[in-house]
Amino acid sequence: MIEIKDLTKSFDGVEVLSHISMTLEKGKIYGLVGRNGSGKTMLMKHILGFVSPTSGSITIDGKILGKDIDAPDNIGAIIENPGFLPGYSGFRNLKMLASIRHKISDEEIKNAIRLVGLDPESKKHVGKYSLGMRQRLGLAQALME
């Protein structure tokens, strides 16, 4: 469970997030909707531990972000456009990312790719993927993380 309490973020005196409070239950899928510049990406960056709040707190599974843990280890997210190496296949891109954490097998990577409707055996380079295929690969990345 993710619990956000009175989260505020300011840059140079300008408040970009103002007293956000919400609870996100484990096992559910959520989406953030809002106009450009409304703070959706900034909120996600806080939840992922990339940015620290000016005030307020984020608790993930009972651990306070920035105090008990630096970043959540069980949350996958796609923020903006995922960056992949265009000269490699989808599987090879995800394999390189997985090698950083040493937590996931080749079969688990292939299953994540299949789950989003792509072929893990395809040798097609990501640079030749359509936008939709790249977005699907980004979802596979979030799932495997």
Which ranges hold each PLM region?
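The feature captures the beta-strand-to-loop junction immediately N-terminal to the Walker
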Residues: 30-35
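Helix-to-loop junction immediately C-terminal to a conserved catalytic motif
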Residues: 48
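Hydrophobic anchor residue at the start of the ABC signature
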Residues: 139
